[in-house]
Amino acid sequence: DFDGWAEGLKLGRSYCGDGLSHVLDFKVNDVAVGEPGSAGKISTLALTQPGKVNVRFDVAALLQEKQTDETRRIRNARLDQKPYWHIERCRIGETRRVPVEVIVNGEVAWRKEIEADGSVSTLNVPLEIKESSWVAVRILPSVHTNPVWVTVGDQPVRASKRSAEWCIKAVEQCWSQKGKGIRSAERATAKQAYDEAKSIYERILSETTRN
């Protein structure tokens, strides 16, 4: 059912990965990623005040039991060399274990090592949510989920000044590289769109207190 698959992708019911690790059935409390949550909002759990939530997911990863010359090459390659994402880069020392992390607002909030033998583990992680946050699961750099948004007191997520500043610079850089290639008849409209994007990130920056 291609239409159903495309709709799920649009709603965020997916994750990014190299195919050698997987995170399935990711939920925060009873809200699943890519599914309607509080007040019907996709991937959103609304809390009236700070409190504890439960993060639940199934996770599996597969590493060769013993390293080879090729897997060592992958593991030791620079991050700007292919393959950029590969489970071998996650191997802990000479073991067959990899780290699973729960991320809150871009920071590691919880970490556990699992055996990367292909078996599926069901994990439940209690977390204290102090402010509106996005929550995701990863084995980096092998798999990363889309986020579940947890709002507190109906406040927006304002995770990081550095992130907002990076986005502003990214918009500016993109325009400096792409703007000259846009047809003159369309350039003013395009510039307006870029300026609007930049203004959104500037507003987010002004509302953010955390670095």
Question: For each predicted feature, which ranges?
Answer:
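C-terminal functional module detector
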Residues: D1-N211
